[in-house]
């Protein structure tokens, strides 16, 4: 139990017991001290100020959860940090319309979250763990991935957790990272990539003419994305440049151009020039503060 010091004008022992009892009651256990005090006042009752409630509840370890139901559990997977290429990959599957109504092609895409390079893809007529396993094995071979160096993140779909896929990852020494079903936004890199793909001007409004045409379109997209697309999340360099470690030199050159422009015409600049420093780390599922930081109110005990 936390040791909380109460001012001399604080609530009496009887009042503290009443605060605990009221706060745990079915009518108030879902509410914050601010809400409890307001509703008690509406009913013509006063037990203490908001700060009194906070101190009493903190003393009794009741600030976090007072319901009978199970406390909320943070379902987000652990944060994954990449400081170099080929440390964390993200992958997913998206649908592409085929000429046959109600039938689809399945595009498997693997992206390095540090460089944003597409490191592997196939376009298939079925969705399966076997296709996924072959994709990951081929990408690992092409990128020269050593055992124990790579984490592969995906959602919780059947191809991602199929026996063939998991056995392949174990054999390759790749650590799987699966999202939780209740978390909708913990594969943002793949989601962003698919949005870029489907908003390309050349992406058909209807269906592709056939599998070969669709594969050729994806091939051109991957080439453009990796080697021509100046990605906003990596300081507008191409994924290939960043994957090969060329981004720092490119960004240094840009910084020099801006500094020279400022030197020639300083009145145009009110502060620093644009930030062209290289991004040194990328995080997937960064942990935000999952608790409410409680600052005790400064209202006096009255």
Q: Where do the PLM segments sit?
A:
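Basic, flexible linker segments flanking DNA-binding modules
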Residues: 1-88, 183, 242-255
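Intrinsic disorder at enzyme termini
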Residues: 257-260, 266-289
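RNase H-like DDE/DDD metal-dependent nuclease/strand-transfer catalytic core used by mobile genetic elements
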Residues: 47-49, 62, 76-109, 113-224
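Conserved small/polar residues in nucleotide/adenosyl-binding loops
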Residues: 292-298
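Charged, gly/pro-enriched flexible loop segments at helix/strand junctions
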Residues: 51, 222-249, 276-277
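Non-transmembrane alpha-helical segments in soluble domains
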Residues: 20, 37, 54, 215, ...
